[in-house]
């Protein structure tokens, strides 16, 4: 399916697939260590190629920050599939759902504490623009962040923890480090979504499009990929 072939481009920052794995693990480790040498950063790498996996610094717990919005989107779309809720179904966010001080392109556009829009638009705001109000509402929609955590682990992704929402992290920035994953767990999840029927074709294509539309990723790994 053409849309599935595009996802490998969208998620290449975590899922590095080589057509030919021509370098040894030791060579790759040396190259990575050379790149990060002298940098004040904690860097972890996971590479999957067919049935082989290579990792560097994978034992540490890396804060997911807004990357957890991908995990939330998966849980939301799966719940919508089970309940027969179309992407075009409309919901209304009220004053209790809108934090005017958090990052929210949605609120910036509508300038209202009562916003009516579709599930699809909400997911787009969360995934493509990292909207925190949309994120918090969608977490509540699936029954809380623990349900997102359980959903991901039921997919076979073990080394991950999701216990905070954007709201709780806004209240205490130190909690931003409580949502974590290893590089390999993120990579395994991305490959599972890419190669298995985690989502319906409609929802897979929708999520892929939302990821490709992410404004914050255009100048990162994606910038070095072929246009086609």
What do these predicted ranges mean?
Residues 42, 115, 136-198:
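Mid-domain, small-residue-enriched loop/turn segments at the edges of structured enzyme/sensor domains
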Residues 63-93, 126:
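Active-site SXXK
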């Amino acid at each position: 399916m053409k849309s599935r072939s595009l996802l490998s481009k969208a998620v290449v920052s975590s899922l590095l697939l080589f057509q030919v794995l021509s370098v040894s693990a030791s060579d790759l480790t040396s190259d990575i260590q050379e790149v990060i040498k002298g940098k004040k950063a904690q860097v972890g790498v996971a590479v999957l190629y067919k049935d082989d996996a290579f990792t560097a610094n994978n034992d540490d717990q890396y804060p997911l920050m807004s990357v957890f919005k991908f995990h939330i989107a998966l849980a939301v779309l799966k719940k919508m599939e089970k309940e027969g809720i179309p992407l075009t179904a409309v919901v209304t966010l009220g004053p209790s759902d809108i934090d005017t001080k958090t990052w929210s392109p949605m609120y910036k556009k509508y300038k209202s504490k009562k916003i009516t829009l579709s599930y699809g638009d909400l997911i787009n705001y969360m995934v493509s623009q990292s909207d925190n109000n949309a994120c918090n509402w969608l977490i509540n929609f699936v029954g809380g962040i623990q349900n997102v955590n359980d959903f991901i682990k039921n997919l076979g992704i073990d080394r991950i923890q999701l216990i905070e929402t954007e709201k709780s992290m806004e209240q205490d920035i130190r909690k931003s480090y409580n949502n974590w994953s290893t590089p390999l767990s993120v990579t395994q999840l991305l490959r599972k979504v890419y190669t298995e029927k985690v989502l319906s074709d409609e929802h897979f294509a929708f999520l892929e499009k939302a990821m490709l539309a992410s404004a914050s990723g255009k100048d990162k790994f994606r910038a070095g990929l072929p246009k086609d």
